[in-house]
Amino acid sequence: MMNRVVLVGRLTKDPELRYTPAGVAVATFTLAVNRTFTNQQGEREADFINCVVWRKPAENVANFLKKGSMAGVDGRVQTRNYEGNDGKRVYVTEIVAESVQFLEPRNSNGGGGNNNYQGGNNNNNYNNGGNNFGQAPTNNGGFGQDQQQSQNQNYQSTNNDPFASDGKPIDISDDDLPF
């Protein structure tokens, strides 16, 4: 059996960070995910999916994501229930994120620098958005933000990314496209 969810969408509001009585960080947020089809009016509808992330990734989500940020979530579906104030059973279905990927550079969210954070508990070496060409991959489980920031201080700030958005349209013809 398998319980696996992969989502890409935008946060509908800033993440909420709380701590359990034992001091464990937990962040909750809602992701707006567009459907792949259009309705009768030709518009794409969206699903609003509640997500929860625990421990250090929760703190990173709260620190680096905000309303409108694009994020990728890899996790599982969980349904829990509790007794509400009126005595009725309340069921909650949410995504428990095992990994949260920040899919936009920090400077598009009001921050600065490269987006070299890889969220989650996995030890993969995927980088999303940072300009790390020619650097050796690190196996730090996604928690090397401080180390990466100190490494970036040793380099002069140059933008060698030909795909960086400087607000100008890209001059390309259809003949240049491979499809």
UniProtKB/Swiss-Prot annotation:
GO terms for biological process: DNA recombination; DNA repair; DNA replication. Residues 103-179 are annotated as: Disordered. The keyword DNA repair applies. Residues 115-130, 145-161 have a biased composition (Low complexity). Residues 2-104 form the SSB domain. The keyword Magnesium does not apply. GO terms for molecular function: single-stranded DNA binding. GO terms for cellular component: nucleoid. Keywords: DNA damage, DNA recombination, DNA repair, DNA replication, DNA-binding. It comes from the Bacteria. It holds the Pfam family SSB. This is Single-stranded DNA-binding protein 1. It comes from Listeria innocua serovar 6a (strain ATCC BAA-680 / CLIP 11262).
